[in-house]
Amino acid sequence: MGCGKTEAALTAAEELMAEKQLDGIFFGLPTQATSNGIFPRIEDWFDKFAGAYDKFGIMKLMHGKAALNELQEELVDGVHVDEERESGVLTSQWFAGKKTAILSDAVVGTVDHFLLSALKQKHLALRHLGFSKKVVIIDEVHAYDAYMDVFLSRAVEWMGAYGIPVVLLSATLPKGIREKLIQAYLLGQGKGIRTRDKKKYASIFQSEAYPLLTYTDGGTVRQRRDFTKEEDKCVVVRRLEENHLEEMLETLLANGGVAGIIVNTVGRAQGLFERLVKVFGRDVSLLHAKFIDTDRVTKEKVLMDNIGKDAKRPRRAIVIGTQVLEQSLDIDFDVLITDLCPMDLLLQRVGRLHRHQITRPEGLSIPILYVMGQSDTLSFEEGASAIYGDYLLARTQKLLPKEIFLPRDISPLVQSVYDDTEIHWDEGVKETYKSAKKKHAINIMKKTNTAQNQFLLRKPHLKIKPDKYNLIGWLDTSITFDSEENAFAQVRDAEESIEVIMLMKYGTGYGYFGKKEDISGQVENYKVAKEIAKQTLKLSSSIARFAFGNIQKTIEWLEEYNRENLYSWQQQPWLKGSLGILFEPVDDRKTGRFYLGDVILLYNYDIGLQVFQNNKKKI
């Protein structure tokens, strides 16, 4: 957590590439946003690496919207290369295809592309070939659930069979998952840990040191714990009832400062924003996943400019957000308020508290974490319960100390929640906890079984038996997915969604939200069409159910709407196949309204997308 994991991984990659004569890396992250965020950093590293060896390297950003990334566009066909330059980074149109992109020397993308190497599907051999000459680096490993872990473990096992180095990064990884992934790699090599050797490795797999480096050396597991120790930071933990929030913020920010509020759902974030903006006005800002992509990028940039490293900080600010604030954003809060969530994620959020060495406003010199949403009866907020389950919330609440010493306490706290050690509960909640524990176990089992039955690639077999194990039967019972997005859906246990392009009506035409310029006559312009293609937001299957009963009927309605209103888009490569919706301006003209079946969609730059049905907010 803030101790240079990325730099360490890239240094390891350089050594491994040299030792094993490999050509590049694959750097995988949980989301498109985190992939975009680290892409310039990896491009700069790879440019220097290629230059040091006097060669060109082909680099690619790999996710569904990579073509819209400005740096990726600059790299296309060697924009960085001139006649006098003999090394560096470029890309090539040949590698631009979805199937061939993985063959580039250096690839940054969403982790899905790595997980797909464990899914039976067409072109699987090509995907494996793409990984065969790379060091694989996967960041934020703690962010993947039990369903994705099945594909992650199998993919790691195949990398072990090929002898491909894999570097896994996390500040808050439960030790059980650490052991499982190490075991998977060794099994791939045909060197799994035997039962009689487990005692020998007990101290390694049970270690709660931080920082910690665990690695395989042939068939042996080794560990390094003797790193330079940074001084522990003491974070004070306090319980906060939400009805005291405004009063608490008034007191905390009396002399200025930046408060972060991280909650578990978009709906809660929007509700708090509407409450607090009445008291604190323009000092309040909001960030979550339900903004148009371009708006979210703008908001993230403003956030980094205001409270990132070496930023000129505002006198007073309140930043409200969801889980997007806990992943890969190098921002700093003077005080942090958070919803209760599982311990590993809670510590990720704490990583944004007093992150940088700066002078703090009076009264905020000590890092304090306020936790909302705790329940003495273990009846947690509905959204938190749905996302994380009551079992992990209950254990986190029970085991959360009044003071956290970072980084010393990171691993012990995470392990205490995930190791299933029995906890003493009062009689009044004992049965509630038992029920939550049982539900958690069933949920994990369901996710694991579903993933294993979801076209999971079989284990690698090192012994050659042409009559039994061969490429001809490799993909028996595989499935042909009609799009890459549908393939991705098989390796993520995520809710289905519909991606739409959202624009505002202006007169008889349409344009971008907040711009008040009609661009409907400029769709044939390459740059305009590309900018339109960036105005996307995903509508969840829940919205589709409220609108038309199910997601398929919603898609069919949107397709008909586009044939009637946006037919010209089908002639433009950037927009062909896209689903657009045109919002009607409301009152202030900053807010747009769109009627989608039985629901009303409202959108504006400050609060994002809201969904109403019968005058009640639904999502």
Model-derived regions, located:
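Conserved two-lobed SF2 helicase motor
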Residues: 101-118, 311-326
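Post-DEXD/H (motif II) to motif III coupling segment of the RecA-like Helicase ATP-binding lobe
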Residues: 129-135, 142-223
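Conserved Walker A/P-loop ATP-binding site and its immediately adjacent core
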Residues: 23-47, 61-66, 173-177, 266
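Walker A/P-loop
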Residues: 1-13, 144, 170
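A substrate-engagement module of RecA-like helicase motors
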Residues: 42-107, 111-115
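C-terminal helicase lobe and adjacent C-terminal extensions/tails of nucleic-acid helicase motors
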Residues: 178, 232, 243-309, 333, ...
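Conserved interdomain linker/interface between the two RecA-like ATPase lobes of SF2 helicase motors
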Residues: 188-269
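Walker A/P-loop NTP-binding motif
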Residues: 6-23, 41, 156-158
